[in-house]
Amino acid sequence: TMLEAGLYYTFFRTHPMELATLVRSSDYYVGKRQILDYHKEHSPNFGQMQAALGLVTRLERWYSDVSAVVHGQIPGAWVEHKSLATVSPIKSTQDIVFNSFEEGEEVLHRLFLCTVGKLFWDTFSYTAKQELLKGLAGDIRARLGLDKA
């Protein structure tokens, strides 16, 4: 998923040797928990920033919800057709997909703000900063230490 790709980016961008090992050997795997633990230990102010944004809670909830659907733990949530002849778009399913995608995008946005965003913040244009901070309350922006200028 885009969220997993984003998680891996935040880790492997500074771990090229581990990435090379992963390419050579499928036995080497870094999971979501290991990446979050890495950020807690090594990304400056990650704990404070993720708490301000509710990142880990939202990430775990999104991951659990999507996993439940993917692994069939919510039967009927995505499939309402009884035969191929009746396959057609279903409004309720589309809403679930769109809402899940939007939440995943928001979680990824917050992940980037807590990790690589802070590192590269001074290189972003004023317009980019405005877009990245859109919708965040002033007190949260202050806690994150991310200016709009």
What is the predicted function of each stretch?
Residues 4-149:
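A cross-kingdom marker of C-terminal helix-rich interaction/assembly modules
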